[in-house]
Each structure stands twice: as structure tokens, then as C-alpha cells.
Amino acid sequence: MQATDPLFALNAHVEPGRAARQVPDDLGVGASLGHFKRYEVLRCVGEGGMGRVYHAHDPMLRRDVAIKVMRPDVPESERRRFRREAIFGARFCHPSIVRVFDMGELRGDDGKVVEWFTMEYLPGSDLERVLARAAAQGQRLPLLSVVDIFRQVLAALHYAHECAVVHRDVKPANIFVTRDPNTRFLTTKLLDFGIALDLEGPARLEVLCGNPFYMAPEQTEIGGAIDARADVYAAGLTFYEVLTGRHPFEDLREAPVEAVFAAQRRRVPLPPSALLGRDTPPRLASAVDMIFERASAKDPEERFQSARDMMEAMLVFLSPV
């Protein structure tokens, strides 16, 4: 495998060496966190709007973990999302869904409470960064790698749907990929169930939430009825983007949210095969278009009716002959 392959770096830590220097390490290297000083913080590996993620070690179980720490000043809505992500991650048990191990609170000297949870530590990168790296190199991901990634993503979604949970935020940034250090096979993990919908409760939207570029038409309207097919739609748009390197509505990146919602409801994107190389075999080009068209149908009744249906179609039509 060439060192320029955007997936090549997945056997290393996330942005090795750089994140630890660039991101403030507020917990402090060598700090302890949790009951009986259980977790030893090693370094900060990332930062987002809600807080930071640390690489740490659990000496009791002799394993590395990731600690997600929420900022103390975030609004209550973000706190609920943070807790929801932890609760669903702890509830699920699937090889393609990141596992959550523990949850707790820290009280600072100023009296502010900081919430945290631990999850499995994954060296690698999310698909958003992989796509950015590929674009910088003028490359696209190989079709077989894309099929392998989505085989695992769709299996994870099917499992969640069987548990009566809709993710509602499927996108490249929430799909993490790494390589098994021994087999070199791709391992994919679905992340962040923070805005997931429990179908055992009300399934109609009272507030809009999610990334507008991956929201199904029924997610863009208050009162829309949501089920597993909303995730199928998001998976279809993500499949298009990962395969071609461009989002179906790439031209709307700077547009108002209302314009993106309108496109999700009414606009039919260019077929993905139009963005692939001319050397793409006609059989594969037709299969790619068919899978995207079925997954991203505006009417939920015309989509794949489950994540498993989409996965099986990909394996039948896009696997090597």
C-alpha cells in the first residue's frame, strides 16, 4: 500500500504528536480521574464545542481509554446530549458501535461541575478527516474500502434500529475508521448517539436537530414522523460523499439552512457515477447510482426499508465478481 493512500495513516494515533501540542491539556498529564484515582490522563487528543477528549490509561483493567470531558459552561441542552451519548454507548453492545465504560463528575475549586465519560480508545481518524486528506492528495477512496466501511456502518445502524433507536446524525464525522494492527483490515465504529431518538417514546419531531446536509426530508419539518429510514437516507448521502469526495449538495455549503432543507425535500442530485472516473465499469456505475437513488429517495416508502436491505444491496452489486 502506498504511503499516499489516505487510509494508510489509520494504523497511527489521531494526528500523531500534533494534537498533544496544539490542544490545551487542562487536566494535566499525570492527573488522575475517577473513583480511587482510576484513570491516568496521558494526553489531550481533540477538542470540540462541547469539550475535550483525552487519551488515558485504566491501570485496574490494564487498558487505554478515551475520556470525553464536557465544558462546565455548556447549556443544559448540550448536557442532555452528552449524557444521552454516554447512556446509549453503554447500552449497546456491537462491534461497530463505540463502547462507553464509565461516567462521572468532577467538581472544580470554583464549585463548577464537569461531567465526563470513558469509552474505548481508538487510534485512527473519522471519515471527515480521511476525506479531507484524500482531497488534499487528489484522491478518492477505493470502492472496496468504501463498501467495507459501509458494510460495518449499516450493520451498526441495523443493530441500533433493532433496539428501537434512530441515530439521526449519520455523517462522515461520526464514522471512525482504524486498521487492525495484525490483519490490516479496516475497522469502522459509529459514534455519537447524542441526538438519537428512542422509538419507544414519541417519534414525531418537536424540535429540529441534526446536520442539515444529512437530514432526511421528514427531519426538516416540525411534526415529521421519524423512523429508521431517516438513517438510511443519511447513510445514502454519506455513501455518495465518501465514494465521490463531494457531498450531493456541495454547492450549498455557504447557503442558508432553508435552502439546504429545500434541496433535501425536492432536489434530485447528480448521479454519483457522473463524478467517478470514465474507467468505472458500466455495471458498477449503474449499481452505485441505483443504491444511492434507493437510499436517498425523498419518500421514505421508496427507500431501502432497513439498513440491512441497503447493506445487502451493496454486498450483492458492489462486491467483486
Functional labels for PLM-detected ranges:
Residues 149-150:
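Activation segment signature within eukaryotic-like protein kinase domains
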Residues 213-321:
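C-terminal lobe helix-coil module of Hanks-type protein kinase domains
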Residues 110-126:
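Conserved short submotifs of the Hanks-type protein kinase catalytic core
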